[in-house]
Amino acid sequence: YEVPLRLVGSEMCIRDRERSFEEEVKLSGFGAAPVKAEGASISYDNAQESFTARYNHETVAMGFSITEEAMEDNLYDSLSARYTKALARAMAYTKQVKAASLLNTGFTTFNSGDGATLFSTAHNTVQGGSNSNRPAANADLNETSLEQAVIDIAAFTDERDLLIAARPRKLIVPPALMFVATRLLQTDLRVGTADNDINALNTNGSIPEGYVVNHYLTDADAFFLTTDVPNGMKHFVRTAMQTSMDGDFDTGNVRYKARERYSFGVSDPLGMYGSPGV
């Protein structure tokens, strides 16, 4: 089988790092600037720390060996090439699964730095408000739910409850929804109706980067949107994949291994929007 296509990075920032872990602090910024009366003193505001997102790097490693007898029987070249490709595929698969795990567990067990699950109706702000990056009621992917997602994202505020005019960027769907996504985003007229209405999602360019299929999503009716809010989902690379080989004196086998260190996480949950479906 071929090495999986590179999906890591389609919905997250990728950064190289040199520490055992990473921490990113979200700052509150300032409130709305007030009007200053003539001759009056200027008003001052204090920025605050909202929450801290922590990324703990994991080491992922795997290896294989070729026996001395296989090398004697001139099987080394064919086996080495095939096993090396299989090892690369195994390493890539683990990375894709770990990246998708943020989405797969984002409604249940994976928490963002503010203590709420990644997709929550209660991402509280330091000013006392809250943001919701999931629908109030679980919804399947259709015209109504996608339009509501665009509206919900537009209502995002910063930590001081100021509107940030957020917009969706890309729709992420499992294979089971790829055809639904095509009809919703790439047709000129509305789908599933005899009315001659335009497809507002398409005409308005509401999802400017279209959609991508993520084969590692485990829920067949969940869908997700990336937004233009910076510092959302991130992938930190502590050590890029390294390969090495050596011979074992006792057995005569030749051993190969691959190893890398990385982490996945979310610095700002407003970088994503998701619905688990019904």
Where are these regions (language model features)?
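N-terminal low-complexity or amphipathic/hydrophobic leaders
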Residues: 15-36
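Long, contiguous amphipathic alpha-helices that act as assembly "spine/axial" helices in icosahedral shell
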Residues: 51-110, 171, 256-258
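Solvent-exposed alpha-helices and their adjacent loops that cap or buttress functional pockets
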Residues: 56, 163-165
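Charge-rich, acidic-biased intrinsically disordered regions
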Residues: 105-124
